[in-house]
Amino acid sequence: MSERRALVTGASTGLGREMARQLAARGFRVAGTGRRERELAETARLVAAAGGECLTLEGSVCEPEVVARHAGAIRERWGGLDWLVLNAGIGDGVDARRFSAERYHRVFATNVGGAVNWLDAVLPWMIEAGHGTVAGISSLAAWRGLPGAGAYSASKIALATLLESTRVDLRGTGVRVVTVFPGFIRNRGVPTEADRGKPFLLDLEDGVRRILDGIESGRPVVHFPWPLSLPMRHVVRHLPPWAFDWLMARLAPRG
């Protein structure tokens, strides 16, 4: 059997499914969470085709009791985890002119609350074992409040800050914490209308390979692709408010 054990949240489609497949190809046993049984079954099929073992866990990361049950199933079957990949996330184009608290709460419940629930369930095992890797998938959108993306940008910087604090707190425990800031990645194997106009868009397979290579690298922070991430991190992130507002007015004019 494979030695390393990984859990990927949000593994029923897109990024999470491809992560599960590629992790299996790298020799991991893989557990994947998701809300839809049929899609999880397809993930399990792809993991098996890549030569791996897959444990599928149906349910929402937003529900602590569901996460606790899933964590118990993993520990009973495998004894623990080596990698916890906090990937589950949703987006919602919430324009402040049509503000919706319900939509904000829904985005935060998945993108932040789901990560908190899994950290609560798994961190004690990793600390006790003296090793493990926690990786959270944030976004380049975390580095500024982008137009029409208030809920998404805010949730992703909340996740990144949570992971940074966790990383500092866990120094000396043997548990690594990695924050990944990817750019645009095609969420399916074929182009869609939603991909139009996204700069430096990466194919799904390539984007996931970069994520996993980054986690394996040992770096605490991973960001890519560099033609987009470097300007975002070192220029746009530090623009004064007047300059940022001027830039956004030209890149995303109000309709």
Model-derived regions: residue spans:
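Residue(s) in the substrate-gating loop at a strand-loop-helix junction
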Residues: 139
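Conserved glycine-rich cofactor-binding loop
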Residues: 12-13
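Conserved NAD(P)H cofactor-binding loop of Rossmann-fold oxidoreductase domains
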Residues: 87-92
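Conserved glycine-rich Rossmann-like NAD(P)H-binding loop of the short-chain dehydrogenase/reductase
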Residues: 26-42
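Substrate-binding pocket helix/loop in short-chain dehydrogenase/reductase
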Residues: 95-108
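C-terminal helical subdomain
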Residues: 179, 195-231
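Active-site helix of classical SDR
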Residues: 119, 155
